[in-house]
């Protein structure tokens, strides 16, 4: 489900590489859209997926939503950001989105960061950092790579505690369930373990090695 999109289509070129808002109004606005991304993250959690959610915003309206689905879809590319970008491209009729912003509850990985740059997003906002696979400053910073032909501005740490706590609670519950299974002599087959502070190589769904 999406909010009512703006009436006119987005141009294919003319990316804007400056933050759309600054100051206290930006904080309130970013929190509003991050809370929408958190709603998506909770949908992922309810489906047994690692709780990461994303929304795409255009002209102050949410035009697309997505949450983590790699386990159920058996698709390693089905991260929340990719789901939201695919949905947004269908809404606007173009894979280029230079007037759009993306909000995601976890720092994007290299795959998702690359897709955002290919889409020529105007601005990206994330919640919790990912010290193992984050590609917006934690492990590497694709958004600061001046050799790329497009630069997307990025801001992190919006509702970071809330976004991070959702992930920590999820993995804590999963570890308890795994211990209970082992105590009962049952093999644990469900993939996707890790945490924000101690993540696996892919906190969005890849099994631990």
Language model features by range: what are they?
Residues 63-70:
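Short beta->alpha transition motifs characteristic of CBS
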Residues 37, 41-44, 54, 64, ...:
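Small-residue (primarily alanine) positions within well-ordered alpha-helices
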């Amino acid at each position: 489900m999406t909010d009512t999109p703006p009436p006119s289509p987005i141009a294919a070129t003319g990316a804007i590489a400056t933050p759309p808002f600054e100051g206290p109004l930006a904080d309130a606005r970013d929190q509003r859209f991050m809370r929408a991304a958190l709603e998506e993250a909770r949908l992922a959690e309810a489906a047994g997926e690692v709780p990461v959610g994303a929304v795409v915003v255009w002209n102050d309206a949410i035009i697309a939503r997505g949450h983590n689905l790699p386990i159920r879809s058996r698709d390693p590319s089905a991260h929340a950001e990719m789901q939201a970008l695919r949905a947004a491209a269908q809404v606007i009729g173009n894979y280029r989105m230079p007037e759009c912003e993306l909000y995601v509850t976890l720092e994007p990985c290299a795959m998702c960061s690359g897709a955002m740059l290919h889409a020529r997003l105007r601005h990206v906002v994330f919640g919790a950092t990912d010290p193992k696979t984050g590609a917006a400053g934690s492990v590497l910073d694709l958004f600061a790579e001046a050799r790329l032909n497009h630069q997307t501005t990025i801001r992190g740490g919006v509702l970071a505690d809330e976004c991070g706590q959702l992930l920590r609670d999820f993995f804590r519950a999963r570890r308890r369930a795994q211990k209970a299974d082992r105590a009962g002599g049952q093999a644990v087959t469900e993939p996707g373990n890790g945490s924000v502070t101690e993540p696996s190589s892919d906190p969005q769904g890849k099994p631990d090695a």
